[in-house]
Amino acid sequence: MKGILGRKVGMTQIFSDNGIVIPVTLIEVKPNIVSNVLTDEKNGYKAIQLSLEDKKKSRQRKPEIGHFAKANTTPKRFVKEIRDMQGFELGSNVDVSIFTPGEFVDVTGISKGKGFAGTIKRHNQKIGPKSHGGGGGSKPVRQTGSLGDISGNKVVKGMTMPGHLGHEQVTIQNLEVIMTDVKNNILLVKGAVPGPKKGFVVIKECAKKIPSKEAVKLVDLEIVAKKNHLFEISKKYNINLKNDMSIEEMESLIEKAKEEQEGKGE
């Protein structure tokens, strides 16, 4: 098992080399500090405690300061344990390079809070009939239905009722890693990730052990920009360039047409 902590930046879309649009979530994954190493002998299970982003000095407590001092660091804002993760020493850094494009990961975060909501929105209950008296004060169409049998004189625990919607821990499984950028501390995963922008997330190796697939080949923006520039130049010489041509082929055709035009001018 392996994992890392990060912050959700937002969603965007990128293109594969064959023109397919891929919706991706961009996650900022700064180097995590290993603030504790848990072992079977001492703790009863194996795990590594990862921590991210320094706390304000005014919010640091003495027990935290002592705990993080063992790892030669300061108290952090976001701290999580990753079970069965091994191979890292106390105080070492974990970066985004532990994942490779084509892998599948599970991403856990706190979903967006939506405040108080009724049962229609919160639990997808059916709206009542709007005809034959429905919709009035005696038969409101969005009111909660029966809460159970007449006997018992209580509401059974877990009954679907109005209440706070969202702001709970959610895990999205089997998201494909599209790209990792160690230099800029960026991880791109295919699809949506729970939580608002700037929300903390935990990225872990997928629990269902889905084998990695071949990494998606992304379009090279430098090559596309260069080809677009050559297409614009080719219009001056009435050359029909094709997109599947290489840059060298395009440049040679343009150079040949340029020489022919200069020869006619002389």
From Swiss-Prot:
<keyword id="KW-0689">Ribosomal protein</keyword>
<protein>
    <recommendedName>
        <fullName>Large ribosomal subunit protein uL3</fullName>
    </recommendedName>
</protein>
<comment type="subunit">
    <text>Part of the 50S ribosomal subunit. Forms a cluster with proteins L14 and L19.</text>
</comment>
<dbReference type="InterPro" id="IPR000597">
    <property type="entry name" value="Ribosomal_uL3"/>
</dbReference>
<dbReference type="InterPro" id="IPR019927">
    <property type="entry name" value="Ribosomal_uL3_bac/org-type"/>
</dbReference>
<comment type="similarity">
    <text>Belongs to the universal ribosomal protein uL3 family.</text>
</comment>
<dbReference type="GO" id="GO:0022625">
    <property type="term" value="C:cytosolic large ribosomal subunit"/>
</dbReference>
<feature type="region of interest" description="Disordered">
    <location>
        <begin position="124"/>
        <end position="149"/>
    </location>
</feature>
<keyword id="KW-0694">RNA-binding</keyword>
<dbReference type="InterPro" id="IPR009000">
    <property type="entry name" value="Transl_B-barrel_sf"/>
</dbReference>
<comment type="function">
    <text>One of the primary rRNA binding proteins, it binds directly near the 3'-end of the 23S rRNA, where it nucleates assembly of the 50S subunit.</text>
</comment>
<dbReference type="GO" id="GO:0003735">
    <property type="term" value="F:structural constituent of ribosome"/>
</dbReference>
<dbReference type="GO" id="GO:0006412">
    <property type="term" value="P:translation"/>
</dbReference>
<dbReference type="InterPro" id="IPR019926">
    <property type="entry name" value="Ribosomal_uL3_CS"/>
</dbReference>
<keyword id="KW-0687">Ribonucleoprotein</keyword>
<keyword id="KW-0699">rRNA-binding</keyword>
<dbReference type="GO" id="GO:0019843">
    <property type="term" value="F:rRNA binding"/>
</dbReference>
<dbReference type="Pfam" id="PF00297">
    <property type="entry name" value="Ribosomal_L3"/>
</dbReference>
